[in-house]
Amino acid sequence: MKTPAPPPDNADDAAAQRGKIRVSVNLVSVLTSVLDEHNRPAPDLPREAFQIFEEGVEQKLEVFESETQQPLDLALMVDASLSAHKEIAFEEEAASHFIGQVLRPGDRLSVFAISEDVTQLVTYTDDIARLQGAVHRIPNGAGTSIYDGLLLGSRTLEHRGEDRRHVIILVTDAGETTSVADFDAARKGAVRSGSLLYTIVIRPVKNESGRNTAGEHALETITDTMGGAMFYPDTVQELDGIFDRINRELRTQYRLGYYPTPRGPANTYRTIEVKVSGNYQVRHRKTYLTGPQ
């Protein structure tokens, strides 16, 4: 158990401590992925190449980290209905390989199975063997509660601390069937947690008439809002490459931070835009929820 900090020695120390808390709460941190025309990460760009806006008003960039070393908390969410897929072994092996590659000192990962219910198979840990074992034991499920899964994953990440990067990786066929939560609740929960979402859609058929295109479009909207990326592998053999791409992107992210001017009202959604000079593709979360004043 963490030992609580001793009380401040005097009133000046107490005031300084309160000031630090206010500064930490007010800082808006924005993880930003910058890709070149070949969809490769673009590292080593200078601070001067970036502009950040809130509600259309340019903000002063107070924090700039290239290839941020901020530790990761990752929620790996696997659609249990994929367990019936004839090539499930490839999917499990790709996810297992990703777990072994992505975790660095200080990082933590949790595995969730999404069926009619959402089950956290392993809580956040750096125990690679436990995590890989859980991926290989995803049970077959009847329903698919994707929105419930996103909401639960977001809530677990929201309480993991603001000094860490929060990431959800969802592997699914996009066939939402049994959630209690709806689209709006899932998106709001994701925004509140400040998480990035990477969605990998395993399509049982390529023809649109046999796919859940409405589910795919809903996930595209949430993923774009959260600043992540969608992937549609044509074969499960492509999964290794997709997981490697996500890993590279997470290791080459820029972390930007600013203190909003003017500050928005309490508990309201504020839009964010990041611009980078040059011919680049830029991804970042599009909005955040203000805290209490």
What are these regions (language model features)?
Residues 1-293:
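Scaffold/interface architecture of coatomer-like assemblies
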